[in-house]
């Protein structure tokens, strides 16, 4: 185990609840409460700005994330953002968007590094300097309340660039936003597939936190359980009434995502994230979908190897919500998720035969923070078997 993973396990805090949390009906109410003005930089997307902010006539500096490039944050995107938003041009950062915008705005609140690469490989210190207000517009990332900023970076081994890319999480309590504002109204513009991927992502966060063998606490478990309960009930509603039923449940979905974020801030995520990161880094599969691709297979792996541990409590919880027998809880959950969003096999995103060896090596090299938090241990062979099962 690496020293950083060991330090996470040694953390004796019962729960980490750093941001002050608000809930508003509209963005206009939030803007009035916080007196947004010309020294505020608002990082968002144009498709969010136009229906919710444009008509307010605010004097903020509105910046659209898409001008820096498509997809999830990368070294190049972050550097382009730094160049476009001079450090002395703002006093406060407002993040209005999904996980990518949350991750980017956490960096805007910190001292600028010498290089983005050095920042993510822990060769430049993280130092919080400016307030960040996080406003999620998806219901999955939970990033609005966590101490992690994820980016696709140039991969290296023993300090030497390999020529490939991977995803790394920058972890520091200094990047936790100062305030969080939950505004369910902002989720109305989210198309169905990104909605489903993000909600499944939140379920993964809650599940991995619940099954965390070393870092879970009684308090984090409360947030995990409530998040799983709300998300699965929401999925049942959609399954019964159709896709548009989600609009009746947006408050619950955005709140459940936040609860899951609180849970994994303390208890941590695990191999679903660890094994999905190279998938996102190499083939640019969106984070929630890449987690979903591996989630069911990893849960089956846990149940096969240690069915009577904490996963039994998980199955009992799922069985109660879904109204099935405990022994059928994981298959029934996987079937429900398939009805919410059909599962793509890895081959559909470009996964190759060579990746069955390359990906486990990358996971073992770069993702120990996540793999050491496994409910049941993995090795290179078991990781390869998971990828093959999902292929």
Regions found by a protein language model. Name each.
Residues 1-92, 346:
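ATP/NTP phosphate-donor binding region
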Residues 50-119, 124, 237-249:
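N-terminal small/polar loop signature for handling phosphorylated ligands or for N-terminal nucleophile
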Residues 113-216, 309, 313:
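A glycine/threonine-rich phosphate-anchoring loop and its flanking beta-alpha core
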Residues 140, 258-291, 368-370:
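Glycine-rich phosphate/pyrophosphate-binding beta-alpha loops
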Residues 192-259, 263:
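C-terminal and late-domain segments of enzyme folds
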Residues 282-356:
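Gly/Pro-rich interdomain helix-loop hinge
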Residues 355-391:
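Short, amphipathic C-terminal "tail helix"
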